[in-house]
Amino acid sequence: MPRVPRSSLVRLAAPPDAVAAAAVERLGARPAGDGTYEVAAPPDEQPAIGLTLRLTPADDEGGGGTDVAITSTGEIDIPFFGWWFQPFVFIAHRRARAYAIETLRAALDGRHSPPPRKTVVGLPPVAFSPEQATFLATASAAVAVVSFAAALFGQLSGPISDSFGASDATIGVALALTRLGALFALFAIAIADRRGRRTSILVGVVGSAVVCALSALAPNLATFTAAQVLQRGLVGTTGTVAFLAVVEEAPEGARAYAASMLALAGGFGFSFSVVTLPLADMAPWTWRLPFALGGATILLAPAIARHLRETARYTALAARTDVVRGRVQDVFERHRRRFVLLGIVAFLTSVFSAPSSQFMNKYLTDIRGFSNTDIALFRTVTTAVPGLVGVLLGGRLAEARGRRPVAGIALALAAASQMIFFLSGGVVLWTMSAAAIFLAGAGGIALGTLDAELFPTEVRSTSNAMLYVVGVVGSASGLLLAGGLSDRLGGIGRSVALTGIGSFLVALIVVPMLPESAARSLDDVSPTQTTAEHDEYGPDP
């Protein structure tokens, strides 16, 4: 990415010598000749912004003033998502120049320097190495690709059921059956502890594209459902392993941030699936077009493979002979309490989140009279900005305030908001949807980060594979419950709202019982267990 300089010009009421002295004393500037001074870029910030100050006598009647031209340089150079960071980088540059100007004014007025400037929301709280940044961007690209494919069945369940002549109960069973893909995901995710994170991620990306193309050609609901079973497993593999990998690879103090960036990429893929909804209004068969687009994402696989490397933490662990990787009994013998608590949370939140997501469009069309185009507008308005802000704020708060309070409070409020959404109409429908998306984004980041942090590297994928299966069982249970009770309760909205009670209670009761991992190193939170009888780590508390 080109290093584009950015400039500000200000006039200070002091001679050049005084301004130069202030720049050297307060900003650590060094003379570069010809009235120019340079401020080195701080190595612990990203982007690392360097400043160049050019001082010239002011051309005014009174004389004695100085024109200061401040130029800032520094970029974030990453593949796939460099465009996303440009607005945040622009804000960071503007703040850096403004801070330098205010510091000079304070020095010339004999005041203390202003407090250090805050990190721009959306930029890393600590610096990533080039390798870490590239890894995060590439894993995020993989998740964006599979998230698009993962969202299609739920988003297009209405047109699909109409095309195949399926009832609410039948499509609910089909959606539930796709959760059988967890059996494949259980193996593919767990094997990442034995064969590495990179392999599992790439298998998911390529396989998801192939199965998406097969879904576009499915002649009947049975064939389509069978393809989606495999689709679900492949998507779950990539999403779960990529999430673990970015948390594993992130620098200390930025694990929740890395998780939030990956979640945003997943949200981008989901949003693109919403954009394709109007295609389903064109003809009874055009719901197949978004699945064809999903198949075309295989063209991105070579670029993802080229930039994706193995995590440094896993590479170091794989070289050791005193550690056994991927042993299931270690999860239950050494980390039983953590696994049980996280399993309860995964099950009960999935009981609500799955029917809430999968049946939302059907609820909007059947109960609220929305067309697919109306739904696309609704989801764009209530999902895009609230989801973006929620994920960004959640990652920041999870680092600053802790994982547990953010996860517990946000997820409880999200469940309550979504339940109200399925029981209301009019303005409340829109506001509750936006609130639920915002809160779920914030709470989900904090909770997901805990899933990755609370298990050591050698069983991180194995434990999360089992948690994934627990969540899938919860999803299937919720789909069957909501679909089966729809007619009895007078509509899909009421039956989905009923499934939210457990999610609300678990956020308030179980989440606070989890260990806190914020402001602790990953090795301190979940130290590696050696095979020695008396090792220096001991069992994880």
Regions found by a protein language model. Name each.
Residues 165, 196, 217-222, 251, ...:
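Helix-breaking motifs and short loop linkers at transmembrane-helix boundaries and internal kinks
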Residues 254-277, 281, 297, 467-479:
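Glycine-rich segments within core transmembrane alpha-helices of 12-TM secondary carriers
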Residues 176-190, 381-393:
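Central cavity-lining transmembrane alpha-helices of secondary-active solute carriers
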Residues 220-228, 428-434:
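Short hydrophobic/alpha-helical segments at membrane-entry points of transmembrane helices
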Residues 199-214, 405-420:
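Structural signature of the two symmetry-related core transmembrane helices
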Residues 153-158, 336-388:
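Extracytoplasmic gate region of multi-pass secondary transporters
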Residues 134-168, 353-361, 478:
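Extracytoplasmic
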Residues 227-264:
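Cytoplasmic helix-loop-helix junction between adjacent transmembrane helices
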